[in-house]
Each structure stands twice: as structure tokens, then as C-alpha cells.
Amino acid sequence: MDSLTDFYERIQPLQTSFASIVPFQAFSDKLLAMDFTAKNDIWRKEVVENVALFATTVNGVLRQAKAKYGIGGYLEHRNIYARSSVFDGTAPRRIHLGIDIWGREGTPVMAPLAGTVHSFAFNKAYGDYGATIILTHHIHELQFYSLYGHLALKSLSRVSEEQLIKRGENFAWLGVP
């Protein structure tokens, strides 16, 4: 596999076989696309540098929109990463490399596809993922990973490396950021 485009072309036809990652009723639950870029003035410095205030602000935005989940975008340029050096390697990283699902603490997290636990850890550095589980998936000779961060700590005590996780299995719970 040479590129993200190749990956997308191989995985896209399979998307209808994915299980929901969180409990979701398509006809009644509202999703809110959330903009975590610098263009959104709600993410002022004092908000993004205070985890509790950030969480309260996101929860307030969801409540106001009457949304069950907030969805953060893939490849979004996020200045929020500047608050921590965790993602600064040879150059600072500001591009979001995943899709966020923001919901109530304790919300069950399910595997979209069958897989195995690749690794799990509590990444405690400021601005890091907190309780994190990475699953390995294999589909038609295609191997890829899915990362679940900001989980409830109890999630880490319920998994082990190489543990098989079934499609749709509740293997973790959302935590706080």
C-alpha cells in the first residue's frame, strides 16, 4: 500500500460492514461537526490550556446544539496542539490525524471491525491521549490500526495484548480529555 488514497480505495467498499463505534440511533441522535481550528474563536488560549474548561466548553456546545456526539475532523489544522510539546518531533505537528467522537464520559466504545489489541497504555503527559488502546485489523491482506484515546481508565484493565476483539464488542468506555 503506497498511499492514503490506496488505503481509502481498499477500505471504502467495506464501510457498510463496520459496526458503530458508540451507541447511535441514526434517526434520532444528533451529531455535531466540531471545528477545532483557529478559525473558531471559541477555542481561546485560556480554554485550550485548561482541560476542565475545555471539556466544559465542548459539553456546553453539544448541549446547546442538542447533539449526542461531537465529531472532530480528519486532517484538521489544530492550533490546540501548540499547548503541549507531546506531538513536537523534528517539527511541531498541528494536523489532526484521526476522527474524534466526543460524548458523555462512560459511553461504551465498540470495535468497528474484528481485531486484536496491539497495545494499550496510559499516556499521562499533558496534552497526550490519556488511556489509549490500539487495535490491529486484518481485512483481505490489508492490515491497519485504529487508535482509541481519552478513554476511561477502567478500559485499560479489561484488555490484554493480542486479545481478540469482535466486531461490535464493547471493549472500552469514553473518559475525559
Regions found by a protein language model. Give the residues of each.
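Short hydrophobic beta/alpha edge segments that flank linear recognition/processing sites
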Residues: 101, 132-135, 166-177
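Short alpha-helix capping/helix-loop boundary micro-motifs
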Residues: 103, 152-159
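Glycine-rich, flexible loop segments associated with nucleotide phosphate handling
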Residues: 92-97, 131, 143-146, 165-168
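Short, well-structured beta-strand-loop connectors
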Residues: 108-119, 158-174
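Short glycine-rich loop/turn motifs that provide flexible caps or phosphate-binding loops at active sites
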Residues: 72, 97, 114, 129, ...
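Polar/charged, compositionally biased leader and regulatory segments
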Residues: 1-100, 104
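Zn2+-dependent peptidoglycan hydrolase active-site motif and core
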Residues: 111-155
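Extracellular structured ligand-interaction cores
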Residues: 96-98, 104-106, 112, 130-132
